[in-house]
Structures are given as structure tokens and as C-alpha cells.
Amino acid sequence: ALAAVTDDVELGPCIALAPLYDSVRLAEDFATIDQISGGRATLGLAIGSNVSEFDAFGVPEDERVERLTDTVETLRGAWSDGPLDYDPDFHDISPDVTITPKPAHDVPIMLGGAARPAVRRAARTADAWCAPSSLSVGGVKKRVDDIRNVRDEEDIEGDFQVYVLQHGFVGDSREEAWEQMRDGYFF
């Protein structure tokens, strides 16, 4: 609905927990969003950290990094011209299959996370990184420097976007706004 009533709003989840999704279904669904929005989609992914979520989906938490990497590779293959040309480790699908629809443009993949390994993973495999609201300005600067260093040292070319997640809540007073959002913020 938002895609239909706007012309320049970038659309997509800030962070979806990649290990909990079927990567081929995610590729199809997100390509559809990109088509509907006229190429304004960005897909944010992360590994997740809440053990109860992994338990609920029956996904071993210790596979989360590998599952994220596998998802990114599957998405890139699914959105390329021709067949998938990638054999996913965690989903039973032939690399010869052609996934449709294709997105309207090259969908940027943004990875989230505050830990140094997460940031370095984003620098290597993604088009963007989302700094969580828990990082200070100094913490964001340190992570951005790390991204630059990784991309320079490993000769990675291309644009790389940095997003900074900030929360905003409205109320008649600061206290009322905090009261209304506190439980959801700490969930």
C-alpha cells in the first residue's frame, strides 16, 4: 500500500532475521515488492540473537551465520539473469531453477549488527550496513572505519551505504512517549 501512494520512499524491512526464512521464498516475495514499488526496495537482514525465536522456528542457533551467508548468496543468484546457479546449503532446490519474478533493479542488501564480525561481514557481502540505535556516535564511527578498512584491504569496489537506526516516539510529554513505547522497545 505504501508503494502505491508514494513515489520516492525507500521500502523494506530494516532487519529481517535471515536464518528464519526460506531464502527462495524471500527472493520471490522481495522481488515482488521491488516490482510494485518501481525499484525502491532495500532488504535488511541480520543473524538474530534471540534463542527463543530460533527454537520456535526449529532452526539451530549455531547455524545462524552460515544461514545468513547462504541467504545472501541465494538472493543474489535468484535475482540474477537466468537460473539460480547456486546450490543453497539449507534449502532443497536445484541450481538450474529460474526464480521469478526478478526485481525491477539490483536490490541493495543491507546487513545489521553491532558486533565487529557482523560489520566486517556486511563490508564483504552486502551493499549497506545498518547501525543499531544502541551504538554511540563514536561507536558508529569506529564501525564505519572498520568497513572502510575491510573494503580497502580486500579491494572491494562499489558503493556502500550506511544507515543509522534511530527510534522516534510521539506523546504529549517525554514521559508519556516513553511510557507508551517502553515495553515494545525492550522486547
Task: Give the ranges of each region predicted by the language model.
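Active-site-adjacent structural elements that line small-molecule/cofactor binding pockets in enzymes
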Residues: A1-F187
